[in-house]
A protein has these predicted regions:
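Glycine-rich adenosine-cofactor-binding loop
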Residues: 1-6, 10-42, 46-54
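Adenosine-phosphate binding glycine-rich loop
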Residues: 15, 103-109, 113-177
């Protein structure tokens, strides 16, 4: 299972059975987390991706290798209406999306990887919004780490058993010589 925030975001897309070829995916913020997400989307031939940033010039350079569209954060009324999936990871010191930004139209999946949060907590109460915030993503990653540790314990037991068999075989082999 995924342990990095960008990997968890990708897992959430998979779990929600997002049609990457046809869904309108908006990625907000220019940073390493979102770069990893753009690489994944590009590798899955996601065509309908928009990169949004406060500074359009930065977004243009960021989106260029993938050929994705770019919008300004100030134009959120324009691009939010058509968004099926919103992935946000900015360095803003406060929330940049409120309930008023999520128009009642159709379902939207929101993945907020920012700390502090980019999306106000009360957005989760909107019935047409499915919100995964940084706390959800941290819990998911920690659960996957626990599962990995459990598997390590099982592997260690198997290694010890096989090592015992080998040592027994080796001592038997040496006694025959």
């Amino acid at each position: 299972g995924a342990v990095s925030h960008s990997q968890v975001a990708v897992d959430i897309l998979k779990e929600n059975k997002i049609d990457l070829q046809n869904s309108r995916i908006t990625v907000v913020g220019v940073n390493k987390l979102n770069e990893d997400i753009l690489k994944f989307l590009s590798s899955k031939n996601a065509r309908n991706v928009v990169v949004v940033n406060r500074h359009e010039e930065k977004a243009l350079a960021f989106a260029a290798p993938y050929g994705y569209e770019v919008k300004s954060l100030r134009q959120s009324n324009e691009w939010m209406q058509n968004t099926d999936v919103l992935i946000s990871a900015t360095s803003a010191p406060h929330a940049i999306f409120t309930k008023e930004d999520f128009h009642e139209k159709k379902h939207i999946l929101v993945i907020d990887i920012a700390f502090p949060r980019d999306v106000e907590e009360d957005v989760a109460a909107l019935p047409w919004v499915t919100l995964h915030n940084i706390e959800d993503i941290e819990a998911y990653a920690k659960q996957n780490i626990r599962l990995r540790y459990d598997e390590v314990g099982k592997a260690e037991v198997i290694i010890q058993e096989e090592l015992q068999k080998f040592m027994k075989w080796q001592s038997y082999s040496l006694m025959r010589d």
